[in-house]
Amino acid sequence: MKQILDFIPLIIFFALYKMYDIYTATGALIVASAVQIILTYFIYKKVEKMQVITFLMVAVFGGMTIFLHDDNFIKWKVTIVYALFAIGLTVSHIMGKSAIKGMLGKEITLPDSIWGKINWAWTLFFTLCAILNVYVAFNLPLDVWVNFKVFGLLIATFAFTLLTGVYIYKHLPKDQHLPKDKHQQRDQETQNDTQQELSGKNTEEK
């Protein structure tokens, strides 16, 4: 559900660009992003910082695009958002904290060295996306950039997320690789051993 909410503003932006122009599409993107934030809050009772940053950038640079009738602002918005993400991850690492670990560490147990590598990998990914957007936005036709923004970056992010998932799985502690029934079996065996020990102690006391 959350992924669908994240994708809807992009689809609306793409559809209205094809039907009308970049300025109509940008206005719709601002409204759709605001609605997305509201729905996310009411459904999940919280909004991620990345979503808030993205919305603020859409509102500011989208508004400037419409007010000044200059699509360069909405193009720069993409690069600035990715650059901010990269800077945020870099700062968190310098401060001795992995932002990625902060998001996933409650559900996944990994050594800090692995979290650090994942943090740097996403820093590099966001940096490359920021640079690539500049090239596509200012060297290729607007139609190409819109397709790149909506589909190219989305597919790249999805693929990199999958690669991150594979990397995390390879470094999970062995007990986290066990299926649920194996966990239950192990817990039952531990419980039985504990009961036997307690029974033995009770026998000795008697």
UniProtKB/Swiss-Prot annotation:
A Pfam family it matches: IspA
Cellular compartment(s): Cell inner membrane
Superkingdom per UniProt: Bacteria
Comp. bias intervals (Polar residues): 191-206
Principal place of residence: membrane
Disordered: region residues: 178-206
Transmembrane segments: 22-42, 50-70, 76-96, 118-138, 148-168
Listed Basic and acidic residues bias regions: 178-189
Alphabetical keyword list: Cell inner membrane, Cell membrane, Membrane, Transmembrane, Transmembrane helix
GO cellular component entries: plasma membrane
UniProt record similarity statement: Belongs to the YciB family.
Function: Plays a role in cell envelope biogenesis, maintenance of cell envelope integrity and membrane homeostasis.
Name of the protein: Inner membrane-spanning protein YciB
